[in-house]
Amino acid sequence: MSNESQATLEDIKYTIVYNAPIAKVWDAVATAEGLSAWFMPNDLQAVEGHEFHLNAAQFGMSPCKVTHVDPPNRLSFNWGKDWTLTFELKELDDKTELTLIHGGWDANKVTEFGQPHTPIREHMNQGWAGLVKKLQGYVEA
């Protein structure tokens, strides 16, 4: 068991406050149109159990399944075979605090595309840094 816990890699986590109402941020993370505008093309429906795909460009269609929906505060979905992506929203007057959590990282695993989790986690961590800024531009426009 200790080997399993040592192999677990820390979740990627970003918290940012957007100058936008919670409904606008919710639409950006919980609708296919919104998510496509700043992340990846997809066919998301914010309904628990809904299976959908993210179009991961050169990696192809990545299967996902919605696991938790609490509008407009929380959306979680499984992504690929190992990951979970969660968006937590908190209303702050006329602003919104978003916490993005990308979990399910394990040093002993590889993605469905054959890539080891450890270097992919580092790459994705940098990618999320840019994507939360892209989301900011979308919701604050």
Language model: regions and residue ranges:
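Short beta-edge strand/loop motif at the mouth of beta-sheet-based domains
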Residues: 6-7, 13-14, 20, 24, ...
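Beta-strand/loop substructures that line and gate deep hydrophobic ligand-binding cavities in soluble
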Residues: 81-126
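Short beta->alpha connector loops
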Residues: 58-60, 80-83
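Hydrophobic pocket/interface hotspot
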Residues: 25, 35, 52, 66, ...
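Short, highly charged C-terminal tails/helix-capping segments
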Residues: 47, 136-141
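Short, solvent-exposed secondary-structure boundary/capping segments
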Residues: 72-80
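Hydrophobic/aromatic beta-strand elements that line small-molecule binding cavities or substrate pockets
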Residues: 16, 64-68, 84-91
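Aromatic-glycine hotspot motif
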Residues: 1-22, 90-101, 137
